Structure formats: structure tokens, C-alpha cells
Amino acid sequence: TDGAIRHTGVIPIAGDQVTSDIAMALRTPTQHAEEIKIRYACALAQLAGAEETIKVPSVGDRPPRDLSRQSLAEVVEPRYDELFTLILAEIRRSGFEELIPAGVLLTGGTSKMEGAVELAEEIFHMPVRLGAPQYAKGLSDIIKNPIYATAVGLLIYGARDDESTGGPNGSQLASGFVTRVRDWFGRHF
């Protein structure tokens, strides 16, 4: 496809729904559910050990509870299954399913969860891997992360398009972007 965008779609499910599922199932505040999701969740229950336990903060003065990591995965897996099933339906609707020889590339923070790639491979029946920005000159390690893949990819795509129409040089745009992101992280972390 020569790097051209052939299809885009929106799937109305993401990490916030997973956090909400965890908060409701474990009866814990959302901020604790988010931390539990990031630190312990697994998208494929068979990969999470039943012997591994985590502490789940309770509401109010109640003491934290122990929960097996596998039980947490049993809360998370159905939402990831739904997400990947919707993505597969979108790929089929696009008419490009047979034109994906190298498989599927997952991006975004939700893709980083343990077991996400393996579950996606089960659903898509094709190779799946995590995608992170790699080919932009000057990218710091902070930005070389699946969380930023979409934003950086769109910037690079736009910069290349600008170059072909006589706009600013793509490497100049990428360099300026990296500087601004690095400065932002320096101020906030």
C-alpha cells in the first residue's frame, strides 16, 4: 500500500472500560482499579497464575482483600475478547482482511497488557505484535512506546505528506515535536 492509509475505524472500547469493569467486579475505587489494571491485569486468564495473589483496596475503613491474579484476568479477558472481536469485524467490513499479509499491529496503552497479543492472535487467526514508533529520527525512549504510536504515526504521515507538497521538512517537524514532548515530560515528571 506504499504507506498510504487505506481504512480507519473507531472501536468504542478502550482501557477506561476495563478499569470500570475491574472497579465494579472488585468493588474498589476507580483509581485503585486503574492501578491494579496497570500493575497486575492479564488479558488472557490462562496466562495468569492462580497462585499469584494481589491486594485489592476496599472502600472506607475495610481492610484490603486478597485476590488471585487469575480471578482478575477472568474479569479483564471478556472485555478484551469483545474489543478484539469488534476489531476483527471492522477489518472484515473494510474488505482488507485478505490484504494483511504481515498480521495485525496493536498500539495504544491497552495493547501493552500481558496476554493482549496472545488473545488477539487467537481471535484474528493471524500474527499480532505490539507497535511502537521506531522510524522517526530523534525520538526519545519515552516516546518509543505503543501508547504514543498513533500520535507519532499521524505526525510522521502528515510530515511526509507536507514534504511531498512542498511543506516543512518532516525531520524538522519530528525534531520539534520530540523537543516539545521531552520538555513537557520534564515539567510534569
Task: Give the location of each predicted region.
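Helical "lid/coupling" subdomains associated with nucleotide-phosphate turnover
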Residues: 1-189
